[in-house]
Amino acid sequence: MPIRDWRQQSQRWPIDYWLIGALAILITLGLTMVASSSIAISEKRFGDPTHYLLRQMFSMGLGLMAAYIVLKIPLSFWRKHRGQLFIVGLVLLVLVLVFGREINGSKRWLPLVLMNFQVSEFMKIAVVVFMAGYLDRHATAVRESFEAVIRLALPFGVMAILLLLEPDFGSTFVIAVIITGMLLIAGAPWRFFVMTVLPIATLLVMMVITSPYRMARVTNFLDPWSDPFGNGYQLTQALIASGRGEWFGVGIGESVQKLLYLPDAHTDFLFSIYAEEYGLIGVAFLALLYLTLLYRCFRIGRKAFNQTHYFGGLIAYGVGIWIVLQAMINMGVNLGLFPTKGLTLPFMSYGGSSVLMLFIGVAMVLRVDLETRQAVLEHSVDESGQGKR
């Protein structure tokens, strides 16, 4: 885009309103679905059908405040403190193993005053920032030397071990794909991944085979109907919910499966209730919203690259990969395409930690967009000044 067009667009649209618009619709849909899917379980557990909705609204408010603060922080701050941010994440992962709250056999949450904080959500944003800084600093080496890529094995290996000890296989997988995607965008050759992914994949397969818990998840995912009232119960109920929606859904608030038939209907399996109430058309619209987020994040990243703002561009790419990958996995789990991962549907599922970190991630992307627009305007002013002289 010519500089003059860029300047005019930056003056008219000081921030990416397509991204803000898609996010606003997702938030609205998310609150609607948390309200609908949690009515029965809220009434049963707390005697208040709005309990989970009110907590989600509080988390959204907290996330918006955090996003506003992050939007005001220059990206140079994150570039300077990327290492400290990652170390804080590792320390929190150790603390959660010692002091964490165990839910459904996993120690993933640190009990705090306002919420149970899921540290793996913090690690996702910490990894994006750390990778952006590393790749910005070692861009040439990453493209030419396998050593520059394998150097990441130590910090991320420690992180992966701590995550798997919780255990949190889903977040480990998401973070691994984020790292891979950012490396590819930075120009790392494919052969580097063949040399690293194959041994890691072999190790993961061995972990699944030797763990009855993980093996049961894989078996249930492959054929949930073989045990519809036992290990396959949750997935079969999710599939029933999705199937009931047909083309146009049964209507907002009219889901049957949310009436204590489908466990975790307001968290990891909220998508199935959404599909039941909104149907295939609603699912297509939801997918379009996530693709819009991905496109806008990648567009912001590309424009940052065009201004040689590689750190900010990589953050935008990393956050885009994170949001859409997690959405795809969650939808796939609900539709029986992937084993259960324990991942939320971004901006939709109930969960304070996820909402908070996602808002911070999007705020960083908006900050990238803001600084890129400012750089374009400054460049155009310099050019006009030189022309007058």
From Swiss-Prot:
GO terms for molecular function: lipid-linked peptidoglycan transporter activity; peptidoglycan glycosyltransferase activity. It comes from Hydrogenovibrio crunogenus (strain DSM 25203 / XCL-2) (Thiomicrospira crunogena). Belongs to the SEDS family. FtsW subfamily. This is Probable peptidoglycan glycosyltransferase FtsW. It comes from the Bacteria. It catalyses: [GlcNAc-(1->4)-Mur2Ac(oyl-L-Ala-gamma-D-Glu-L-Lys-D-Ala-D-Ala)](n)-di-trans,octa-cis-undecaprenyl diphosphate + beta-D-GlcNAc-(1->4)-Mur2Ac(oyl-L-Ala-gamma-D-Glu-L-Lys-D-Ala-D-Ala)-di-trans,octa-cis-undecaprenyl diphosphate = [GlcNAc-(1->4)-Mur2Ac(oyl-L-Ala-gamma-D-Glu-L-Lys-D-Ala-D-Ala)](n+1)-di-trans,octa-cis-undecaprenyl diphosphate + di-trans,octa-cis-undecaprenyl diphosphate + H(+). The chain crosses the membrane at residues 15-35, 58-78, 85-105, 112-132, 145-165, 169-189, 192-212, 269-289, 311-331, 345-365. Keywords: Cell cycle, Cell division, Cell inner membrane, Cell membrane, Cell shape, Cell wall biogenesis/degradation, Glycosyltransferase, Membrane, Peptidoglycan synthesis, Transferase, Transmembrane, Transmembrane helix. Residues 1-14, 79-84, 133-144, 190-191, 290-310, 366-389 are cytoplasmic. GO terms for cellular component: cell division site; plasma membrane.
